[in-house]
Every structure is written in structure tokens, then in C-alpha cells.
Design a protein with these regions (language model features):
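PDZ-domain C-terminal substructure recognizer with occasional recognition of PDZ-binding tails
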Residues: 103, 231-238, 266, 272-275, ...
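Conserved PDZ fold ligand-binding element
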Residues: 73-78, 193-197, 269-292
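Flexible, gly/ser-rich surface segments that form the specificity/activation loops bordering the active-site cleft
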Residues: 61, 126-172, 205-211, 229-242
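Active-site-proximal beta-strands of protease catalytic cores
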Residues: 43-47, 77-81, 136-147, 177, ...
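Conserved active-site neighborhood of the chymotrypsin/trypsin-like protease fold
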Residues: 20-24, 51-53, 65, 70-152, ...
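C-terminal cap/linker of serine protease catalytic domains
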Residues: 1-36, 124, 150, 192, ...
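Gly/Ser-rich catalytic serine loop of serine hydrolases
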Residues: 64-68, 127-132, 174-192, 265-271
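A short, Trp-centered hydrophobic/proline-enriched beta-strand micro-motif
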Residues: 38-55, 59
Length: 337
């Protein structure tokens, strides 16, 4: 069962199973302020099932589990998108253990946010959005999963910096927190005023940043990243802006080089004949400095469907290949489609 992404190439984290596992590994928090204590009931459990023939099933699993946060009085829940990607069933569990069927409302690949809605709204108070820009180095906050105070951990912000994911994902000003929360996917980053500041995405081994000693923590997607796209995502399920070009490459940096660590089966790079272990040097004649530079140059090339020329290296031989980019959202199925 996939329970969240981590920073390695295996794609799925392996936290403890269910609420009991979280409680067993957390010390608990006492003397919570009233705003925080009241907000915790909005954190819900989320389970999804994914058909075996869906493309994400191999890497993320056919059963996924994490958290979400109730954000309105009509059952709307925000979570991290990979938990609901290609799911055909969604079940929400509230703080009292009630299981509520839900359905996918929207998923934004660029930010990573996912939205689902319960068929019947849970009888709990929703959490309001806060201002994630208020968080800076050493700011204090709480990380919460379903279960109230027993599933809550006090954390500090270890950094605010750019995060480049190997799956063609780039997030400005991501929030890194310590210590690590064991079941991070979709968990709530709650401000001291009880507002929602971020949604849990990753377990990372270098939460303190480049050049600092390795120290495990979590990466949270800032809630301010959701605000400008929220209304359209609720109304349409995805954004109407032209989709970014997508290659279907999983890229890692190794000894100063950009190396293909994996390829999406049937995606643009796969169809063009690229292989795991290939080294990327340039895109449309422009040298690639690092992964963020690669993504920015790819996305600046035009909308999805644009053809790009990659200069590659394989077994010490250089070659060029033209790849017709695709739309990631069309590669994956949406809900029960």
C-alpha cells in the first residue's frame, strides 16, 4: 500500500499502518491553544483504490492511504494529489471514525494539490486557509493527521526553498519542517492560530538544506499556492491554461550530471527511445545546468505537444533525439473515466 512519496527513486514511502501506527510513534502534544485544538477535527483520513491497469498503479500502488483537510461545509477536502491520481474509489474517515464515500473534484499536477468531496458532508468544522508566507526559518507550527491531539506533532520550519522533484515537478518556496512526521501524505501543516498553512507531500532526508548535515523532515506544499487556482480547480477539475510540455522522464542529479533514473511507460520519452541511465546535456541547443534549469527550459519551449530536441549521452556516445512532448493529464486517467 502506497502511503506517500519520499525523496528516493522508489516513489512510495512506507509509514505505519493507520491511526494506531501514527499514535505509537508520536509523543503527543499537550496544552494546545484553543484555535489549534478546534482545528484538528477538520483533518480526515483518506483511502483510495486504483485499478491495476492504471499507469500510476505500478509506482504508487493500487491502494493508497493518507490524510486530507476539510475546507468547507459541503464536504470539500484538500489533499496531496498523488493519493488520488487515477483513483476509482475514495473514502474519507473523520475524527470519529465515520467512513464517508467521496469523489475526485480536481487535481493540479503543477502544484500537486488534489481536491475530493464527500457525498455527505461530515459534521465537523472546516479549517480555514492561513497565510503560508508568514512562515520563515524556525517558525513553529503543528503537523496533524486524523486522530486529533494524539496524531499531532509540533514542528519547526527548517527552510523555505525551491524544490525540484524528479517527476518533472518544481515548487517555489516549499516548506520544510522537522522533525519528520511518519505518515506525511496529505497531512495538515497548521499554524499557531489554527489555520491551514500547507499540505504534506514528502519525506526528505535533507530537510535542513544543501550543505547541511542529513536530517529527516517533511516537505509541505504552501497553501498560498492553491489560492489563485482554487476556484477554477473546484469548478472545472483542472486549469484552463495551456498544459506544460511533459516528457515522462524521472531525472536525478549524479556527479554533476542529469541522469535518466526512470521513464514513464508509453510516455513521450519512452516512445522516442530514451533509456534509463541516459545523460541529458542540452535542450534545443541550450546547455542544462541542473534539474530546475532543465524544467524551466522545457516549459518555456511551448505548450504540451511542442517538439524539443535533446542532446543525450549513452555509453559515452553523444546523440540528439527529437521528442514530441505530451500532456501529463491526458496520460493519466481521471477518476473512474
Amino acid at each position: 500500500m502506497a502511503r506517500g512519496l519520499n525523496g528516493s527513486m522508489n516513489g512510495a514511502g512506507h509509514g505505519p499502518t493507520g491511526r494506531e501506527g501514527v499514535e505509537a510513534r508520536l509523543p503527543g502534544v499537550s496544552n494546545l491553544s484553543p484555535p489549534v485544538a478546534q482545528a484538528l477535527s477538520a483533518v480526515v483520513g483518506l483511502k483510495t483504490t486504483i485499478p491495476k491497469d492504471r499507469r500510476s498503479a505500478q509506482t504508487l500502488g493500487t491502494e493508497r492511504e493518507g490524510h486530507g483537510v476539510l475546507i468547507d461545509d459541503k464536504g470539500l477536502v484538500v489533499t496531496i494529489g498523488y493519493l488520488i491520481m487515477e483513483a476509482d474509489t475514495v473514502t474519507i474517515t473523520d475524527i470519529d471514525g465515520r467512513e464517508l464515500p467521496a469523489y475526485i473534484v480536481g487535481y493540479d499536477y503543477e502544484s500537486g494539490f488534489g481536491l475530493v468531496r464527500t457525498v455527505v458532508p461530515p459534521p465537523v468544522r472546516p479549517m480555514t486557509f492561513g497565510d503560508s508566507d508568514s512562515l520563515s526559518l524556525r517558525s513553529e507550527a503543528y503537523v496533524a493527521g486524523v486522530g486529533g491531539e494524539k496524531a499531532t506533532l509540533k514542528v519547526k520550519v527548517a527552510g523555505r526553498r525551491e524544490f525540484a522533484g524528479y517527476w518533472e515537478y518544481l515548487l517555489d518556496n516549499a516548506i520544510f519542517t522537522v522533525p519528520a512526521y511518519p505518515l506525511w501524505g496529505g497531512s495538515a501543516l497548521v499554524g499557531m492560530d489554527g489555520t491551514l498553512l500547507g499540505v504534506g507531500s514528502l519525506l526528505v532526508q535533507e530537510a535542513l538544506g544543501p550543505g547541511a548535515p542529513a536530517f529527516p523532515g517533511n516537505m509541505y506544499v504552501p497553501i498560498n499556492r492553491l489560492k489563485p487556482i482554487f476556484d477554477e480547480l473546484v469548478a472545472k477539475g483542472r486549469l484552463s491554461t495551456p498544459p506544460r510540455p511533459w516528457l515522462g522522464l524521472l531525472t536525478v542529479e549524479h556527479m554533476g550530471q542529469l541522469v535518466v533514473g526512470g521513464i514513464s511507460d508509453g510516455g513521450p520519452a519512452d516512445r522516442a527511445g530514451l533509456q534509463r541511465g541516459d545523460v541529458l546535456h542540452a535542450l534545443d541547443g541550450e546547455v542544462l545546468d541542473d534539474i530546475p534549469d532543465f524544467y524551466r527550459k522545457l516549459w518555456a519551449s511551448g505548450p504540451a505537444g511542442t517538439a524539443v530536441t535533446l542532446r543525450m549521452e549513452r555509453d559515452n556516445d553523444s546523440f540528439e533525439v527529437t521528442v514530441r512532448t505530451g500532456d501529463r493529464a491526458r496520460y493519466h486517467k481521471f477518476g473512474s473515466d
